[in-house]
Amino acid sequence: MRKKPIIIGVTGGSGSGKTSVSRAILANFPNAKIAMIEHDSYYKDQSHLTFEERVTTNYDHPLAFETDLLINHLKELIADRPVDIPIYDYTQHTRSEKSYRQEPQDVFIVEGILVLEDQRLRDLMDIKLFVDTDDDIRIIRRIKRDMQERGRSLDSIIEQYTRVVKPMYHQFIEPTKRYADIVVPEGVSNLVAIDLINTKVASILNETH
């Protein structure tokens, strides 16, 4: 019977560098069966709303996510069964009709701004990380990403940041730092922290697989 996969939770504010940290872990284990699952894929379907209504979505609130589905999918993967993960369309502000098949792996990195907010999700994790990065750096990264990758205007990004992103960070995201096993200041540039994390993952892999 297949051993239980290692589940690593990686969180932090938008633009903190959590995706880069996740990729650094992935890159360190090229021969392992390892995959990343993004909480963003589980934003709720909003096809029943008008586009104007969808644009006002608060993406930084726990209720924006269908976390129950993510939890169910992780339980299926733990049970060695594949799942179909939804794909979110940021240009239309709703879930795409497409999905992708995720096969069971030895390691899953579950990444997103609120992956430590739900205790049921935390309870499935073996290692929990919080990537802690200065607010100014995070907003600059968010502006670059949303303009280049999501077709957003500068004005809309700044308006959303001041109205939603910053207050939600302090209300919901930053408080989850207390649940982290490791807090990673400076993100992927913190080579000592990345090395410690990779050493721990390797140790668990050697013990259980």
UniProtKB/Swiss-Prot annotation:
It is found in: Cytoplasm. GO terms for biological process: CTP salvage; UMP salvage. It comes from the Bacteria. GO terms for molecular function: ATP binding; cytidine kinase activity; uridine kinase activity. One of its GO terms (cellular component) is cytoplasm. ATP binds at residues 12-19. Its EC number is 2.7.1.48. Gene3D superfamilies: P-loop containing nucleotide triphosphate hydrolases. Pathway: Pyrimidine metabolism; CTP biosynthesis via salvage pathway; CTP from cytidine: step 1/3; Pyrimidine metabolism; UMP biosynthesis via salvage pathway; UMP from uridine: step 1/1. CDD domains: UMPK. It catalyses: uridine + ATP = UMP + ADP + H(+); cytidine + ATP = CMP + ADP + H(+). Pfam families: PRK. Keywords: ATP-binding, Cytoplasm, Kinase, Nucleotide-binding, Transferase. InterPro entries: P-loop_NTPase, PRK/URK, Uridine_kinase, Uridine_kinase-like. PANTHER family: URIDINE KINASE. NCBIfam families: PRK05480.1, udk. Belongs to the uridine kinase family. This is Uridine kinase. It comes from Streptococcus mutans serotype c (strain ATCC 700610 / UA159).
